[in-house]
Amino acid sequence: MARYLGPKLKLSRREGTDLFLKSGVRAIDTKCKIEQAPGQHGARKPRLSDYGVQLREKQKVRRIYGVLERQFRNYYKEAARLKGNTGENLLALLEGRLDNVVYRMGFGATRAEARQLVSHKAIMVPGRVVNIASYQVSPNDVVSIREKAKKQSRVKAALELAEQREKPTWLEVDAGKMEGTFKRKPERSDLSADINEHLIVELYSK
C-alpha cells in the first residue's frame, strides 16, 4: 500500500479527530469541520459495527504514526511476542521509531517532516548517521542533528514550535546543541488517552 500524499486534513476528518499531521501547536480549529467526513458537504457517517470501530481505531493510530499497513501488522506481531500488555507494547514500539523520536524531540514540526530529516541523512544515533525511519531507538541513545543540517530553517522553526508543546518526560533535549537523549521507553500513562489500543488488539486477535 502506497503512502498517502493527499491533504492531511482529509485524513483527520475521516477519523473524526486531530491526527496532528500538520505543524502547529493548536488542535485543528472547529472551522475545519473535524466532525464531518471528507467531501464538500461532509458525508453522513454511518453507525459502525464493533469491527468497524476497531478498524477505525487501527487506521487512526496507523495514520498518526505514518506507518503502512504491513508495517503496522508486523509491529503488532512483535508486540504480541513481547512480555507484558500487547497494546502497550505496540504503542512503545511505535514511539520508539526514529522518525517519531525526532518529532517528539522537536527537531521536526510533524512526523512527516521528521521522517524526511531521517531519510535525508540529517540524523545521527548515537554518533553515526541513520537514515531508516523505522530504526528502533534504545534507552539512553543520543539522537542528534548532523552539523551541516543544524542551519536548516525548518529545524529551527520546529524547535520554536516544540517550546510551546508539552515536553515528553521520557526524553531529555538540549535545543542549543540540537540533540536529545531517549531516557526510557514511554509508559502508557505518558501517552495520549485518546488512543484505545485495546480495540486494535481485539481486531488482530480475531
From Swiss-Prot:
Has keyword rRNA-binding? Answer: yes
User: NCBIfam families under this entry?
Assistant: PRK05327.1 (NF003717), rpsD_bact (TIGR01017)
Q: Which InterPro entries match?
A: Ribosomal_uS4 (IPR022801), Ribosomal_uS4_bac-type (IPR005709), Ribosomal_uS4_CS (IPR018079), Ribosomal_uS4_N (IPR001912), S4_RNA-bd (IPR002942), S4_RNA-bd_sf (IPR036986)
A single Gene Ontology biological process assigned to it is: translation
Gene Ontology molecular functions: rRNA binding; structural constituent of ribosome
Q: Which GO terms describe its cellular component?
A: small ribosomal subunit
Transmembrane residues, as ranges?
A: none
Tell me, what does this protein do in biology?
One of the primary rRNA binding proteins, it binds directly to 16S rRNA where it nucleates assembly of the body of the 30S subunit.
Query: SUPFAM superfamilies this protein is in?
Result: Alpha-L RNA-binding motif
Q: Which family does it belong to?
A: Belongs to the universal ribosomal protein uS4 family.
Q: Which residues form the S4 RNA-binding domain?
A: 96-156
UniProt organism field:
Shigella flexneri
Q: Which UniProt keywords apply?
A: Ribonucleoprotein, Ribosomal protein, RNA-binding, rRNA-binding
Disulfide bond annotation, renumbered to this chain: none
How the protein assembles, per its UniProt entry? Part of the 30S ribosomal subunit. Contacts protein S5. The interaction surface between S4 and S5 is involved in control of translational fidelity.
In its UniProt entry, what is this protein called? Answer: Small ribosomal subunit protein uS4
Q: Name one Pfam family in it.
A: Ribosomal_S4
